[in-house]
Amino acid sequence: MSFISKCFICLLFSTYFLPPVNSAVLQVGFLAANDNTTELAPFIGWGQVAGALGVAWSRIVEYGLLPGYETMNLTWVLTNCREADAVGSVINYAEGHAHVVLGPPCVRPAQVAGSVAKYLDFPLILWGPPFDSSLLNQFEYPTIASTTSSTLYQATSLIRLLEYYKWTEIALIYYVARSDLIPRCTPLISDFEGLVNNNDNLTITYRRQMSVITNTSYATALRNLKELARVVIVCLESDEARRNLMISISENGMDGDEYVYIMAESRRAGFASSFWNGTDGKNDLALRAARKFLVMDNQKYNDTTTFVQEVRAAFSRPPFSCPNCTNIDPTVSQVGPLGDALLLYAYALNRSIATGNPNPTGTEFCEVAKGMEFLGFTGKVIINQNSTRTPLFVVYNLDSTDKEMIVMQITEDLDDSKDPVASSVNYYITLVATPAQIWDTWGGTVPLSTPICGFTGTDCPKSFTDQYLAIILGCTAAALVLIIAVISTIVFLVRSKRQEEERLNQLWQVHFSSLVKPPQKNTMHSSRSLQSTVTTSTKVTINSKKDTERHSFYFLNNDSVVARKHNFRATFTKNDRAMFRKMRNVDNDNLCKFIGLSLDSPTLISIWRYCSRGSLQDVIAKGSLQMDWFFKYSLMRDVADAIYYLHHSPIGPHGWLSSSTCLVDERWQVKVSFFGLSAIKQYEVKEQRDFLHTAPEHIRDTNLPITKEMDIYSFAIICSELITKKSAWDLENETFDIEELVYKIKKGGRSPPRPSLETEDEHNGSMSLLVRDCWNENPDQRPTSEQIKTLMKSMNHNRSSNLMDHVFNVLEQYASNLEDEVQARMKELTEEKKRSDVLLYRMLPKQVAEKLKLGQSVEPETFDCVTIFFSDVVSFTTLASRCTPLQVVNLLNDLYTTFDAIIEQHDVYKVETIGDGYLCVSGLPHRNGNEHAKEISSMSFSLLKAIKTFRVPHLPKERINIRVGLHTGPVVTGVVGMTMPRYCLFGDSVNTASRMESNGKPGRVHISTECMKFLTEVIGGYQTEPRGEVIVKGKGAVQTHWLLTDDEIEAKENGESI
């Protein structure tokens, strides 16, 4: 068939669905291969790619890229990569006023057609497989743009990767399996060799094109390569070739850490196809070699599945109308770049129209397209200065779990001042994994271009040791003897001195490894306090403590300790170490036991004995503890005794005394911590809150030495907290902040600020006077620790000095009052429980309610024979329409209250009311033998009798009447639901009873045949009257009966109508 006839047929089949050509129609030509060409169809076959144009046009319309074009007139020619057909098609399209031609998809037709397009100044957009560097020549092909990249870009990226790791000697192995119309490895290797020839630092030491891909041919190539290179560039065009190479690499022992194989791919698949898997049992060999491979491939795009689904859907619509075109493989097919090609033209035309040129020529189109960026079907599309897509290459390897991992990206530098294909310096590498991750399967080391001992292992240079070994050994032996003698003497002297020092310092040094963290419980904690948010009125075990900003908690030799953190490292003098030993030996009832320092911990810590009730600050802040005057006095006396001891001991004044450093043990005894440690305190920086307990003179000059008068001032602030049972200065209820308050304290004056001592609790006025004397602005006028101790002793008035005795007395009185309170509350609880039970028994059967109260499940229960009652108010809808909603509710309430009173006189269980409907049953949940039909019948007679006298309050002339239906049969019961549980009946008997009611008559009892037989044959004494057959929904014609009341029996006997 001639070319012209082929074009005519394609045009005939591709334009019938679109409107006539006019100024609002985008004319697009499309060149592809026929689906029956085996070597081309998987890549550029019409049935693989054409649907992408339908998807692309939908996106153009959705984004409003071409508002002036209402439709697209798409025509195509299946040139099968023939140069003549491609040239003829381009000429026909150009003369036919097409806007653009998408193709040709093959290199040689693109070169010929590109020359013709240059002459016609007509735009072509290439979308086929990567092409070689010839088409990048803008002078020769100024009207060609491309949404696929050139093999030169990948070759340049390979050069950049080699330069990055300083690999200079390389080998090439490649295998060509594809048609020379759409080659991949051949142009890539050609471009790569051209770049290497222009690079003085790189050398190709071995090159092999495989003609066959058997293990034997690979083994021959690998044996020759082994003596020439360790870095191998691989390009293979089939998974079989890839797998066989890997198996041969392992079988020939070339899968060691010194080898690296770089596989060049363009499938956007990386390792995803797991091409080492096969059926010959050699998967392990192939995988072992795969771990030494780096795969350079185009970056994958995430939305492939959705795009392919849209393409398949587009194939089923005109103009393609190919519902069977569904076998699309995006890793082989160029379906994505084809869709991007149409998007590129739409974006470029949009930009050209915006600049006033609605009909750009091919050259103008390419100029507009340069530098354009948009999100296409294959990810982000960037057009460089060659009107070609800038590729983003990624390098994959296998991690330690043999999972694919991206380790680096290689991108083009889009600096317009540079030629993007001139040199590898225009490409840069971005590592997306650490070097350790990249080279994990190589033992964590980057392979060398040339092994240290050469490719044959015989070129290792002799070391200095090998050349002069004898001389070295002799001199070393002599020197060694001399050195050993000198070192032995020095070691003996140093060791003796160190042992003495260690013996003395072992008293206060604690190895961090001996500290054991307690198991933690979930509890909130403060960042400053020793005490978490648990109550301070009870003893708190260390297990419930969590580390804070200043403190950590440990076990030391099974004893609970607390470690205060010091975020610095200090050098201690001999005097400092002597002071630590003295502190270690301190044993006072009101001082927290100093355990020592841990010098080998991550941060310097001082270790103290743990006090279970936290600090005074925590006790006061909690506010839940009832403290009478004696309790407060005892705590203040303990603090005063601690100050007295420190001021009369070698340790000296505290300097950091505050309510947070006064700890409380399980016996409610105050123990002052963080005393001494002057060598550490000089490096500590006080926070603003710490200055609230600091004497004014020290705030003004922090370089002043610590004095006893400072401790007296701090004691006064602590006492004010105990007296008022509030934090220092009660900042929580004040409007000023800490900085402002500290400034006022520092400023002083005639009336310096001091905490309030106002309290509603009982307190001793003498104590308030003592506190005011202790915080005197003039340090010289403050009392001494001896005077404080004497004055506080006089305040006790000869009462018991034991706080625990006082606490026990208070607890006994509290326990007595608590017992009375508990009895009263229990009585109230019992009454409430009775009321709850009454309400529950009204909602559920008693035996069911009892099970639910015990937490037991209520299993469904089957009852073989019960009698079910249904009733309904006659003409209730009409009656309700004449009433207000409130009147309807009152009416039903009065009616059902009357009914409920009647039910209580019979062995009947009320199941529920639904509007004006009433459902009852007898024989469950309490089984009553055969009495259920009798009970229901008697109740029915009573209800009919009661409604005769019932009156509607707001409609006194109206009369209420009901229909009644009864049925006897089996049911299943169960409790349904967790929220508002209901005791429900299930079974056909319920439906039958309902049908008896709905087919009954006002004022009469309509019963089923089963119920009639039970009343007349089992129980006896009841009279019924056949009604005849009634059409019952779901059952057809059913024989039913009337149950006669006493009045009806009498009327019947008198010959009156019922």
From Swiss-Prot:
One of its GO terms (biological process) is cGMP biosynthetic process. Residues 492-1058 are cytoplasmic. Belongs to the adenylyl cyclase class-4/guanylyl cyclase family. GO terms for molecular function: ATP binding; GTP binding; guanylate cyclase activity; peptide receptor activity; protein kinase activity. It catalyses: GTP = 3',5'-cyclic GMP + diphosphate. The extracellular and guanylate cyclase domains are essential for chemosensory responses. Residues 25-470 are extracellular. The keyword Cytoplasm does not apply. GO terms for cellular component: plasma membrane. It comes from Caenorhabditis elegans. InterPro entries: A/G_cyclase, A/G_cyclase_CS, ANF_lig-bd_rcpt, ANPR/GUC, Cyclic_nucleotide_synthase, HNOB_dom_associated, Kinase-like_dom_sf, Nucleotide_cyclase. This is Receptor-type guanylate cyclase gcy-22. It is found in: Cell membrane. It comes from the Eukaryota. Guanylate cyclase involved in the production of the second messenger cGMP. Regulates chemotaxis responses toward Li(1-), Mg(2+), Cl(1-), Br(1)- and I(1-) salt ions and methionine in ASE right (ASER) sensory neuron. May regulate ASER neuronal activity such as axon sprouting and calcium responses to changes in salt concentrations. The chain crosses the membrane at residues 471-491. PROSITE patterns: GUANYLATE_CYCLASE_1, GUANYLATE_CYCLASE_2, PROTEIN_KINASE_DOM. SUPFAM superfamilies: Nucleotide cyclase, Periplasmic binding protein-like I, Protein kinase-like (PK-like). Residues 501-809 form the Protein kinase domain.
